[in-house]
Amino acid sequence: MFHSKAAFLKVENLEKSPVSVELGIEMAAQFGGDCYYPDGTVLRTPDSWKDFFRIFFPSNGDSGASESDQINILGNHVGSYSAAVGYHFPTWKVKAYWEHFFEDRSGMTLTYGMWRDCLTGLEVTLPENPFVKTVVGEFLYTKHQSGAFHYFATPAIDHSFTGADNYYNNSQYAGWEHWGQGIGNPLVTSPIYNKDGNLAFESNRVKGFHIGLNGSPTPEIDYRILVSVAKHWGTYGSPYRTIRRNQNGLLEVTYKPDQIPGWSFTLAGAVDGGNM
């Protein structure tokens, strides 16, 4: 089962100030159902109303949950903090935005220093410019993951390290994917592309750039250009021996003839490259 919740605040009054501010938090969780392991073991996870409240207010599972969910939090949780600042000029506007994602408490707090993993972007909107109406540039960084180690204290070593967050993966659930397609940032390569049939995200330590722009050079023609490049380091548990790269591009043109109101025709071409 799936549960999500979000809370956002937007402050904007363009009659008094050209500045707008947005702040928010999103959280989502997978819980319930059966977990299938490669050795044939099937784990049925709790899904009662009591368990739903443990998902809504993230807390430990009871005796019916797995040992991992009793030690940690019931279910597979992810979330993000978001912030954006916009400025409205007389004929155009600009917005800078930032999103920090987390898998557990170590990513929600500043326990391991300032948050390094984030998506940072800048959007410029030029409504009066027909050739380029919107330009977006983004930088993605997911390499830190609260550090490289995940270890619970023992009598021999009395310190815990809750890093190696392993974004989108989970020891019980198949992870944040549906039929092999990732539910998240597209620069984190989906499991459907794994050559060995594994359902895990084999590379979630990524550094990438994305740029997109669109426009309408004539009333009948719209276009869109998207370009993304990324470097992949694998995961902390299974790092790549050498850095792998991925490049993607899209060109799309839409024709909306005045002679046929309500109709549009789209022609698109895309290219993928790299060694992922």
Predicted feature locations:
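Signature for the C-terminal beta-barrel architecture of outer-membrane proteins
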Residues: M1-F152, A156, F209-I211, V227-Y236, ...
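C-terminal structural cap/anchor segments
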Residues: S146-T235
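Short amphipathic alpha-helix initiation/capping segments at coil-to-helix junctions
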Residues: E202-S203, T242-N246
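A generic structural motif
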Residues: Q247-G249, G273
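Short glycine-rich, acidic/polar surface loops and turns
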Residues: G249-K256
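Low-complexity, intrinsically disordered Gly/Pro/Thr-rich segments
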Residues: S264-G273
